[in-house]
């Protein structure tokens, strides 16, 4: 992400004017978390106009527009973020020239033209999101291939989601006769070669630190041997010079949940300790463990968590990005104060993306939860109850 300028709004306390140029899908997700309904956007859009009555001659102009946001449409996998809004008055006179106020327009973000966000409410969480988006070390540095016989999934693991880049599926023949064995071996070779080709196409080996190959049985080990074999045959230096980034892990399935199994497995913690998402999985796993044990060290729900924070008892505060993107600005500010309170008492605050299975799970538990430093029973009872 390129932050071209960020100015606090002198007329609107708590507001800001930010000019950005997103560079990848992670940046789109950052913008999605920052822009709220009723914020204003200034952007450039191409308009095609007819010059004659026959409509044969046309001109395409790049027009500067300003809209107030009504709604958004976001798809992480397809790198798609679109805002719908209505044109508003631009006091500077630079935008909406020859475009009437009140006209409904849409704006799809791209990686070519910078755009400006005029926010009514810009808080420290949004500032943190921008800082992280500009930090290349914080970007996705982990890929994973999870497989079993005849099926494989090539994925990127980011702080905001597990992105399926390509699914490879082959129908494997049954080995009843000698000819079937030969067919099986041929199909197996094609299967592994297809995975290798998908990895070359969809993964940027220059930016990755870790590539997880995981499977039940020995499929992951065979895949790694095949990857290095094919790389030797092609003299693929990007792979041959980075053999150390590959590691093999065991999981129970060749589907996406197999990646989650690996990320939360303590056996692989040392190899994954530098990845942000691995930390989130381990904390969420600990929360669910305490919840299942019913040992009064894990609570969810706003009332219970706020009460635990008042005691200074929170070790980890867990929030979804959805609650921090709430239309209720006052409630959003209360959650930010809660994060400050927890951190000032030595705890840590984690924000989980609802595009990940972790965030989805927390969202089903009210979107706010905590792990305590010590057990606190009866947090769910009213203060006046005996």
Swiss-Prot record:
Pfam families xref list: eRF1_1, eRF1_2, eRF1_3
Gene3D superfamilies hit by this protein: 3.30.1330.30, eRF1 domain 2, Pelota, domain A
Keyword tRNA-binding part of the UniProt annotation: no
Cofactor(s), by name: a divalent metal cation
An MF annotation (GO) of this entry: metal ion binding
Swiss-Prot/TrEMBL GO biological process terms: cell division; meiotic cell cycle; nonfunctional rRNA decay; nuclear-transcribed mRNA catabolic process, no-go decay; nuclear-transcribed mRNA catabolic process, non-stop decay; positive regulation of translation; positive regulation of translational initiation; rescue of stalled ribosome
SMART domains according to UniProt: eRF1_1 (SM01194)
Any one Gene Ontology cellular component term annotated for this protein: cytoplasm
Assembly notes: Monomer. Component of the Dom34-Hbs1 complex, also named Pelota-HBS1L complex, composed of DOM34 and HBS1.
Physiological role: Component of the Dom34-Hbs1 complex, a complex that recognizes stalled ribosomes and triggers the No-Go Decay (NGD) pathway. In the Dom34-Hbs1 complex, DOM34 recognizes ribosomes stalled at the 3' end of an mRNA and engages stalled ribosomes by destabilizing mRNA in the mRNA channel. Following ribosome-binding, the Dom34-Hbs1 complex promotes the disassembly of stalled ribosomes, followed by degradation of damaged mRNAs as part of the NGD pathway. The Dom34-Hbs1 complex is also involved in non-functional rRNA decay.
Name of this chain's protein: Protein DOM34
Organism of provenance: Saccharomyces cerevisiae (strain ATCC 204508 / S288c)
Gene: DOM34
């Amino acid at each position: 992400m390129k932050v071209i300028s960020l100015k606090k709004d002198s007329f609107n306390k708590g507001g800001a004017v930010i000019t950005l140029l997103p560079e990848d899908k992670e940046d789109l997700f950052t913008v999605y978390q920052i822009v709220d309904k009723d914020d204003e956007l200034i952007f450039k859009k191409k308009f095609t106009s007819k010059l004659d009555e026959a409509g044969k001659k046309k001109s395409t102009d790049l027009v500067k527009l300003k809209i107030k946001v009504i709604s958004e449409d976001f798809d992480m996998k397809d790198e798609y973020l679109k805002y719908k809004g209505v044109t508003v008055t631009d006091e500077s006179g630079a935008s909406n020239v020859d475009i009437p106020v009140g006209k409904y327009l849409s704006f799809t973000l791209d990686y070519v033209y910078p755009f400006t966000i005029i926010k009514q409410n810009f808080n420290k969480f949004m500032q943190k999101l921008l800082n992280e988006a500009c930090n290349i070390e914080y970007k996705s540095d982990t890929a994973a291939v999870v497989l079993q016989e005849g099926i494989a999934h090539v994925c990127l693991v980011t702080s905001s989601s597990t992105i399926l880049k390509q699914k490879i599926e082959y129908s494997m023949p049954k080995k009843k006769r000698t000819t079937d064995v030969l067919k099986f071996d041929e199909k197996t070779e094609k299967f592994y070669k297809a995975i290798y080709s998908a990895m070359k196409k969809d993964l940027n080996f220059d930016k990755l630190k870790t590539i997880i190959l995981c499977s039940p049985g020995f499929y992951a080990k065979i895949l790694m041997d095949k990857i290095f074999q094919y790389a030797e045959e092609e003299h693929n230096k990007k792979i041959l010079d980075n053999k150390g980034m590959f590691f093999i892990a065991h999981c129970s399935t060749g589907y996406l949940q197999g990646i989650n199994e690996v990320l939360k497995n303590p056996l692989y913690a040392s190899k994954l300790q530098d990845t942000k998402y691995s930390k989130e999985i381990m904390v969420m796993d600990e929360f669910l463990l305490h919840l299942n044990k019913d040992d009064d060290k894990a609570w969810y729900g706003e009332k219970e968590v706020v009460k635990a924070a008042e005691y200074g008892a929170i070790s980890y505060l867990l929030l979804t990005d959805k609650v921090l993107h709430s239309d209720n600005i006052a409630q959003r500010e209360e959650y930010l104060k809660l994060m400050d309170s927890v951190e000032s008492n030595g705890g840590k605050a984690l924000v989980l993306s609802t595009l990940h299975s972790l965030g989805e799970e927390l969202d089903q538990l009210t979107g706010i939860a905590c792990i305590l430093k010590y057990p606190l029973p009866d947090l769910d009872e009213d203060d006046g109850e005996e």
